[in-house]
Amino acid sequence: MSENMNIKSKIITQFGVNSKDSGKSEVQIALLTNRINYLQNHFSLHKKDHCSRRGLLNMVSKRRKLLNYLKDENISRYINIINQLKLRR
């Protein structure tokens, strides 16, 4: 398995019910956060990569929508994921 798949499977098992549960909102938010953090490090080296920056903005927007959905559905799960990932509210 590649390093990326190992990281992804660890995130899924940490935030999901089992290793196959990738559809849960918390898992999707955690996976997006991991990719966003990776791209932020990428931009420190490649400042003029505007195509990837557009993808980053799309990921941030999708994560915000998932967080808003989770906040409306279950506030305790929302607070838990915010604290675990150390995100701002």
Swiss-Prot record:
Alphabetical GO biological process terms: translation
Gene3D superfamilies: 6.10.250.3130, S15/NS1, RNA-binding
GO molecular function annotation: rRNA binding; structural constituent of ribosome
Source species, domain of life: Bacteria
Family matches, as SUPFAM superfamilies: S15/NS1 RNA-binding domain
GO CC, one annotated term: cytosolic small ribosomal subunit
A Pfam family reported for this protein in Swiss-Prot or TrEMBL: Ribosomal_S15
Keyword Ribonucleoprotein: yes
Keywords, comma-separated and alphabetical: Ribonucleoprotein, Ribosomal protein, RNA-binding, rRNA-binding
Family designation: Belongs to the universal ribosomal protein uS15 family.
Oligomer and partners: Part of the 30S ribosomal subunit. Forms a bridge to the 50S subunit in the 70S ribosome, contacting the 23S rRNA.
Function: One of the primary rRNA binding proteins, it binds directly to 16S rRNA where it helps nucleate assembly of the platform of the 30S subunit by binding and bridging several RNA helices of the 16S rRNA.
Protein name according to UniProt: Small ribosomal subunit protein uS15
